């Protein structure tokens, strides 16, 4: 089965379970916490993703992880289901999809803002305010850094890309210059 479909199915199942308990926000925190713990610990990540390690050992790892952090029964059962079905390798994707489902249910638009340098809190607030004014909707902004854009920002949401970066401007100029045919120009007499 396609990875995106699997991810969507698991995220929807987790969301529906959380919704029935009215714990959607708590589950988002938990799935992000568990994901970051697993992603940050390479040994645990490899162990849980390995087809060689038996499921009993994987369950033991999850149980010891759960002892150290307080997570709900829904999240514990979900992690055990992922182990049972050998799907722990898609946990990070499930967390991202779950996050999108939660924000969609609250009518909050997820927006990615890329800048060359880390934006100051006042700059982040200014960007958020102006994006929300443009979209006429509450947003959840994910700020990212990409030095290759040189300056300015790039805004992404849904299938929209707004490029206000120096690199984007230079690319447009380069493309325009490439389309100009120098041989068609006639010298002025």
UniProtKB/Swiss-Prot annotation:
Matching Pfam families: OSCP
Bilayer topology annotation: Peripheral membrane protein
Main subcellular localisation: membrane
Database matches in InterPro entries: ATP_synth_OSCP/delta_N_sf, ATPase_OSCP/dsu
UniProt superkingdom: Bacteria
Compartment(s) where it occurs, according to its Swiss-Prot or TrEMBL record: Cell inner membrane
GO cellular component annotations of the record: plasma membrane; proton-transporting ATP synthase complex
Single Gene Ontology MF annotation: proton-transporting ATP synthase activity, rotational mechanism
Keyword set, alphabetical order: ATP synthesis, Cell inner membrane, Cell membrane, CF(1), Hydrogen ion transport, Ion transport, Membrane, Transport
SUPFAM superfamilies given in the database record: N-terminal domain of the delta subunit of the F1F0-ATP synthase
Chain's role: F(1)F(0) ATP synthase produces ATP from ADP in the presence of a proton or sodium gradient. F-type ATPases consist of two structural domains, F(1) containing the extramembraneous catalytic core and F(0) containing the membrane proton channel, linked together by a central stalk and a peripheral stalk. During catalysis, ATP synthesis in the catalytic domain of F(1) is coupled via a rotary mechanism of the central stalk subunits to proton translocation.
Similarity field: Belongs to the ATPase delta chain family.
Subunit structure: F-type ATPases have 2 components, F(1) - the catalytic core - and F(0) - the membrane proton channel. F(1) has five subunits: alpha(3), beta(3), gamma(1), delta(1), epsilon(1). F(0) has three main subunits: a(1), b(2) and c(10-14). The alpha and beta chains form an alternating ring which encloses part of the gamma chain. F(1) is attached to F(0) by a central stalk formed by the gamma and epsilon chains, while a peripheral stalk is formed by the delta and b chains.
The name this protein goes by in its record: ATP synthase subunit delta
